Amino acid sequence: MPGFRDLNQRLTALLADRVRKGEVTERGLSRLTGVSQPHIHNVLKGKRFLSTETADAILHEMHLDVLDLLDPRELLEWQQRR
């Protein structure tokens, strides 16, 4: 199972992809989370990491779940271990 750093990177990649596709803007993410737009920009460029609080806020506001960041094979592997 991936750790927080890996999940953080996956969330960042997902957000960067959505920004690239025009589904959301850096400013929009800033408004949703209360985090400054420059900080969001630096996160998307890999210069900063999201705090757990900010990651949770983004997941909540974008109607995502941490499970959305997992590969289906990872979920299956986790379920088989339980």
Please give the residue ranges for each predicted region:
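Short, charged recognition helix plus adjacent turn
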Residues: M1-P2, L70-R82
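A short, Lys/Arg-rich alpha-helix, primarily the initiator
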Residues: M1-V24, G28
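Short alpha-helical DNA-recognition segment
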Residues: K21-N42
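Residues that mark the N-terminal boundary/hinge immediately upstream of a DNA-recognition element
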Residues: T25, S51-T54, D65
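Short, basic-rich loop-to-helix N-cap that marks the start of a DNA-contacting helix
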Residues: K47-H60
